[in-house]
Amino acid sequence: MDVILLEKVPNLGSLGDKVSVRPGYGRNFLIPKGKAVAATAAKLAEFEQRRAELEKKASEELAAAQARAEAVARLNVSIAQKAGEEGKLYGSVGTKDIAEAVTAAGVPVERHEVRLPHGPIRLAGDYEITLHLHSDVNATLNLKVIGE
């Protein structure tokens, strides 16, 4: 199945690319999420008319993500959790906790934008957390987990 991408899709292509994908991926994911349209002659013509509008929207999203990344880089966020001896936390600090703390500090962040490659944080200490704000923008957050 051939589709035209309406936005950048990781490991597939960028705005305006005509790519061939498996039918289920196109019908069940790309088209319903608004990331692509079927590559018919009518859709190709319609896309060419809307290309400038879509490119402008994509550049605005990128600029907004870069502004959020700069704001996140200036933050120092602290999260207090109950902890036992040697700084081992009762429970853990996950993506939801981090997203709520950053949002409370003034920069809106969604839970799915927080990357914890080693799983939830289970020890008190200082951490550098990666936030994936856009397909082209990553930010680093300084997080301090305080054991009470």
From Swiss-Prot:
This is Large ribosomal subunit protein bL9. One of its GO terms (biological process) is translation. Keywords: Ribonucleoprotein, Ribosomal protein, RNA-binding, rRNA-binding. PANTHER family: 50S RIBOSOMAL PROTEIN L9. It holds the Pfam family Ribosomal_L9_C. It comes from the Bacteria. The lineage of its organism: Bacteria, Pseudomonadati, Pseudomonadota, Gammaproteobacteria, Methylococcales. GO terms for cellular component: ribonucleoprotein complex; ribosome. GO terms for molecular function: rRNA binding; structural constituent of ribosome. InterPro entries: Ribosomal_bL9, Ribosomal_bL9/RNase_H1_N, Ribosomal_bL9_bac/chp, Ribosomal_bL9_C, Ribosomal_bL9_C_sf, Ribosomal_bL9_N, Ribosomal_bL9_N_sf.
